[in-house]
Amino acid sequence: MILVTGGTGFIGSKLMQMCKNTIACPSLQNMAEDDIIRIMEKHEVHTIIHTVAISDIGVCQANPEASYLANVQVPVYLAKAAKHAKLICFSSDQVYSGMEEDGPYTEDTVKPNNIYAEHKLEMEQRVLDIVADAVMLRAKWM
């Protein structure tokens, strides 16, 4: 089974339509790591596709704690719960937002210039520390 976070959002809903054997993860807003583990065990999840984020830069700047929870801590919970599951996380091309020259850029050449981008970069690093083969998709805003 594939667990899709943000199953009612723009990207998540498209994934739910395209992929077989998917379930939408309930809201992660008040979930703890144990709640995610229970969902994964109940549905025998083998893949997690994480699409949820607070992506409005202005909202992130005004509410850094909420941004950190949504954009860093929740993905870390998913990584810890994903012991035997493949984890795919949507990140952002904003990690390159401080670059002076136009891309393309290498994966290691990052320069975030706003709190959203900083949180996305921290998410990538922390998740990969937990799940080394996790996939990070640095998508443009959609």
Locate predicted features.
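N-terminal Rossmann NAD(P)H-binding glycine-rich loop of SDR-like oxidoreductase domains
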Residues: 1-19
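SDR active-site strand-loop-helix element
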Residues: 5, 48-52, 87-93, 137-139
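Glycine/Thr-rich phosphate-binding loops of Rossmann-like dinucleotide-binding domains
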Residues: 12, 57-58, 97-98
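Rossmann-fold NAD(P)-dependent oxidoreductase module
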Residues: 14, 18, 81, 126
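A short beta-strand-loop structural module common to alpha/beta enzyme folds
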Residues: 21-31
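NAD(P)H-binding glycine-rich loop region in Rossmannoid oxidoreductase-like domains
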Residues: 32-70, 81
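Catalytic helix-loop patch of NAD(P)-dependent Rossmann-fold dehydrogenases
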Residues: 69, 73-74, 95-137, 141-142
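A short helix->loop->beta-strand "cap" motif at the edges of active sites that frequently abuts
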Residues: 82-86, 132
